[in-house]
């Protein structure tokens, strides 16, 4: 393991297989946390989540799905006719979900994902709750809110980051390319089939990543050099964390004023608040501290308008839809995001001995990059779910049941902020004050989402009042 790595989670040995949960009955969220989340161990879930949390199986019926979201207009991406890939600069076209399904039926090669949706852009006057409402469930996922819980009981006290929908069609299989993500993930297959090849984060340094690693945290989260604000082990940038701290202090000051506590105590917190605001402004805008002395209490939320750069997962589909074709390390395009490897789909499949790459020549450097790793293979069918901890590398091959008719592959993602206090189910994040503020804001956003969509949803628990959901079914 590299000196850059402090990873303490599960690392497979030869002969290991991904564990399978056949039944969630009698399994508590704490059981799941202790066995899998805390140990950073992927697990296949064969048992359905309780009806109160998950009715995604209804989306297997296309008529039902279209009745829910058919009229919603989204951006859909065509395959690049030159490279045969998705996500490499092709213009995305707006169309209704009904029109998208019809084009798939007619044989057009298109892909829909909400993971890098830009239609919910930041508008002047948006506060953080408004931004969270837009980002937690991008269109058309918000049209399906009556069918799933943003905070499923199984995930205990983890804070949700986003929910995503993926729809495509391919008889022979399309590939995501080998990459990692920055959040814990529950991947649910609605229709079609998915084959995952997964590799633990402790092999990151040998996988020819596009970016240069600065650190692999104990929970496996990978940070990169050259970022304006390097990621912390909980997935936040320093700017994110500083803003959250100002929000926590702002809320606490307001509460103390209502309680009429001594002014001296309030003044100490106000001084801390002002210092934190200065840090935020210097990271966000730059310039001398004295330029910002006129800011009033309550300005913290406004700092978020456009303050945070692109989501590191926003280019997740860079190679989605890639037909198998030889690509050497030297041929890899420089615009690959940091978290993608330069190992081609062919190289990985050749190393794994998959039939589609048996007769394909690949660069020896690709095979040597994979030597010493212990990839695990996960085959998922409709109804299956996979828990994958943050920064586990994975290549996903998606395929439909058949090429004719209306068969499509549909998947759904839950993303959660990665825990960095792994031994504490009740408080899975080390920076409690910051995550108390984040939980409160996420809870408000969830309330707004479900109020709009006519469903009641339990908020994620505050850090000082952890989740008391005891069973998953």
UniProtKB/Swiss-Prot annotation:
GO terms for cellular component: chromatin; nucleus. Keywords: Meiosis, Nucleus. GO terms for biological process: chromatin remodeling; meiotic cell cycle. It holds the Pfam family Cupin_8. Its main location: nucleus. Has a role in meiosis. Residues 452-473 are annotated as: Disordered. This is JmjC domain-containing protein 4. It comes from the Eukaryota. Residues 140-433 form the JmjC domain. The gene is jmj4. One of its GO terms (molecular function) is 2-oxoglutarate-dependent dioxygenase activity. It is found in: Nucleus. SUPFAM superfamilies: Clavaminate synthase-like. It comes from Schizosaccharomyces pombe (strain 972 / ATCC 24843) (Fission yeast).
